[in-house]
């Protein structure tokens, strides 16, 4: 199960020795993900005919965000593919431009968190010249690309570089941001007992001071077939999506939702090979 990392435990003990406002205390894992919206979601899906929507709303809850709730009429190629292709990803069926998202009453099961979730975070700079990183946005999506969590996170230290050119984050986004402790707890709730998919996912876990069982991590950065594209080095997500999907992402400012969907799509595209690679690695250890 997901748990606090040793680094977090050490940091937490130090902070507790200094009772200042805004100090971080060790969160406890309690309760389960709320499903209070599921009935209303199913109702929306059952009354929706050929409605074209995507999820862009930022939420600070762990409730599933229904795709049918947004007013945007089309879905991105990544979102459309994750939602419409149930099992094996067929690259030839991936649209190159935004496309209407079909919905039916049979789609309600896709709104559940499920077995697999993908995570991506955006960072801002703290410390001298903004050289250190702090969490400022976190997004978690399920197997079908549905947003489970997408929220801005208020850094615990003063931000010295918003890195807006790449993160897309500006100071006004912090007005509705949640605190770090809450973000950490919500993440723990969502990834607990799940297969966690990510690109260089340890960076996201480290920034959250969380750990996750290695056997339940699927890091697209480490898959041999993907590393071949970068000459044996760690490949960029942008390069992998362009190579295998022929779709451009990260044009200008990044979106952690888009990056999480891109990572899940890559995982699903090579799911069988990635799982076999994991089994082989476990045998060698």
From Swiss-Prot:
Q: Which InterPro entries did the record assign?
A: Exonuclease_RNaseT/DNA_pol3, REX4_DEDDh_dom, REXO1/3/4-like, RNaseH-like_sf, RNaseH_sf
Task: Name the Gene Ontology biological process terms.
Answer: RNA processing; rRNA processing
**Residue spans of biased composition, Polar residues class:** 1-14
Q: Cite the residue spans of the region called Disordered.
A: 1-35
**Which top-level enzyme class is recorded in the Swiss-Prot or TrEMBL entry?**
hydrolase
According to its UniProt record, what is one Pfam family this protein matches?
RNase_T
Chloroplast recorded as keyword: no
Q: Which domain of life is it from?
A: Eukaryota
Name the family the entry cites: Belongs to the REXO4 family.
Function according to Swiss-Prot or TrEMBL: Exoribonuclease involved in ribosome biosynthesis. Involved in the processing of ITS1, the internal transcribed spacer localized between the 18S and 5.8S rRNAs.
- What protein name does the entry list? RNA exonuclease 4
> What organism is the protein native to?
Candida albicans (strain SC5314 / ATCC MYA-2876) (Yeast)
């Amino acid at each position: 199960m997901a748990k606090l990392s040793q680094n977090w435990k050490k940091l937490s003990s130090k902070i507790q020795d200094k009772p200042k406002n805004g100090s971080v205390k060790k969160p406890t894992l309690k309760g389960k993900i709320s499903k209070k919206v599921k009935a209303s979601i199913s109702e929306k899906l059952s009354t929706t005919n050929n409605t074209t929507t995507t999820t862009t709303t930022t939420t600070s809850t762990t409730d599933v965000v229904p795709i049918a709730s947004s007013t945007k009429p089309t879905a991105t190629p990544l979102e459309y593919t994750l939602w419409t292709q149930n099992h094996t990803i067929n690259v030839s069926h991936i649209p190159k431009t935004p496309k209407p998202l079909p919905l039916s009453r049979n789609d309600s099961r896709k709104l559940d968190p499920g077995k697999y979730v993908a995570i991506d975070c955006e960072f801002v700079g703290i410390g001298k010249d903004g050289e250190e990183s702090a969490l400022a946005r976190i997004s978690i999506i399920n197997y079908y690309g549905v947003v489970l969590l997408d929220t801005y996170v208020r850094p615990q230290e003063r931000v010295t570089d918003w890195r807006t050119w790449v993160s897309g984050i500006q100071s006004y986004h912090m007005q509705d941001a949640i605190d770090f402790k809450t973000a950490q707890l919500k993440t723990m709730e969502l990834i607990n007992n799940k297969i966690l998919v990510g690109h260089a996912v340890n960076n996201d876990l480290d920034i959250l001071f969380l750990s996750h069982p290695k056997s339940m991590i699927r890091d697209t950065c480490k898959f041999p077939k993907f590393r071949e594209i970068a000459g044996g080095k760690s490949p960029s997500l942008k390069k992998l999506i362009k190579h295998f999907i022929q779709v451009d992402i990260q044009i200008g400012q990044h979106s952690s939702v888009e990056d999480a969907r891109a990572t899940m799509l890559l995982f699903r595209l090579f799911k069988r090979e990635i799982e076999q690679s994991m089994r082989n690695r476990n045998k060698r250890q």
